[in-house]
C-alpha cells in the first residue's frame, strides 16, 4: 500500500487519432459504386451513370448491382418473372397498415414495415449469401406494393393490383396514382425510372454506412435495411428531399422563386 500509484491514461492513445465525423477515414471499400469528384462522376460497377440513365431501366441497374453484370434479355425476363412471383404482401403487413395512425410519417411506416417483412420472410432464418440475394429480389417486388399500400391506406383509397406487363417505374406510378398507358403517364414513369437509377447507389453515404455497420454484426438483411431507413429519414440525409419539396410548395410558382430566395437569404434562412 506504500507504493505510489502512477497517474496514466487507461489506454495508450499515442498511436490513435481522432477524426470527427470520420473525416479522412477509409472505413471500407465498395465494388458496387464509385463517387468520383473528378471527371468519372458516379459509376455503378464501372458503368457511368449517364450511360445507365440514358440506355438502361431501373430493373437492369438493380440486376447489375445484385449480380455484377448487365442482364441478357433471357436473364432480364427471368428476373422480371421472379419479381412478379414475389409481388405479395404478407397478411401481418396488411394488418399493420390497417392500424397505422393516419398522417404518420411515410419513413416511419416504411421502417416498421421493413421489420415486419423481415419477420414474415419465408427465409427469415437463413442468412447465407444466396438467401440474401433472394431476399433482395423479394424486397424489390414488395417495397413498391408496400409504399403504395401505405399511401392508399392513409388516404382511404382502394389498393391497386400490380401489372406484370408494366416496368418497375410504371408499376410504382400506377400503384400510387392509378395512372398508366397514356403519354403523360409514360413521361412521368420515365422521369421516375431515371430518378430510381440515380438513387440506386451512392457508395458510402450515411444510410449505406449504417446498414454496413449493422450487417457487420452478422445480423439479417432486413435489420440492416431497417437501420438504413432510420438513417435516411434524417433531415441531413434523405429527409432533405422532403424539405425541398416543402420549399417548392411554399414558393408556389417560378414567378415567385427569385423573391422567395432573396427574402430567405436576407433572413438567413437555410435554403435546401
Residue ranges and their predicted role:
Residues 2-272:
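Hydrophobic alpha-helical bundle cores within soluble ligand-binding/oligomerization subdomains
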Amino acid at each position: 500500500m506504500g507504493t505510489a500509484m502512477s497517474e496514466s491514461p487507461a489506454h495508450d492513445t499515442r498511436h490513435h487519432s481522432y477524426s470527427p465525423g470520420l473525416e479522412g477515414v477509409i472505413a471500407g471499400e465498395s465494388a458496387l459504386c464509385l463517387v468520383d469528384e473528378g471527371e468519372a462522376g458516379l459509376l455503378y460497377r464501372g458503368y457511368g451513370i449517364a450511360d445507365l440513365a440514358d440506355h438502361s431501366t431501373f430493373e437492369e441497374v438493380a440486376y447489375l448491382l445484385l449480380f455484377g453484370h448487365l442482364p441478357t434479355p433471357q436473364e432480364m425476363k427471368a428476373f422480371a418473372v421472379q419479381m412478379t412471383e414475389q409481388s405479395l404482401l404478407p397478411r401481418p403487413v396488411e394488418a399493420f397498415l390497417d392500424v397505422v395512425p393516419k398522417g404518420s410519417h411515410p419513413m416511419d411506416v416504411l421502417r416498421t414495415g421493413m421489420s415486419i417483412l423481415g419477420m414474415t420472410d419465408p427465409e427469415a432464418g437463413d442468412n447465407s449469401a444466396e438467401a440474401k440475394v433472394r431476399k433482395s429480389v423479394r424486397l424489390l417486388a414488395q417495397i413498391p406494393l408496400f409504399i403504395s399500400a401505405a399511401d392508399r391506406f392513409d388516404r382511404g383509397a382502394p389498393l391497386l393490383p400490380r401489372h406484370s406487363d408494366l416496368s418497375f417505374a410504371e408499376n410504382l406510378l400506377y400503384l400510387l396514382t392509378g395512372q398508366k398507358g397514356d403519354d403523360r403517364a409514360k413521361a412521368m414513369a420515365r422521369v421516375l425510372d431515371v430518378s430510381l437509377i440515380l438513387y440506386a447507389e451512392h457508395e458510402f453515404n450515411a444510410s449505406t454506412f449504417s446498414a454496413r455497420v449493422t450487417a457487420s454484426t452478422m445480423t439479417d438483411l432486413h435489420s440492416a435495411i431497417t437501420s438504413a431507413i432510420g438513417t435516411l429519414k434524417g433531415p441531413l440525409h434523405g429527409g432533405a428531399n422532403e424539405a425541398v419539396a416543402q420549399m417548392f410548395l411554399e414558393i408556389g410558382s417560378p414567378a415567385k422563386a427569385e423573391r422567395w430566395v432573396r427574402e430567405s437569404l436576407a433572413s438567413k434562412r437555410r435554403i435546401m
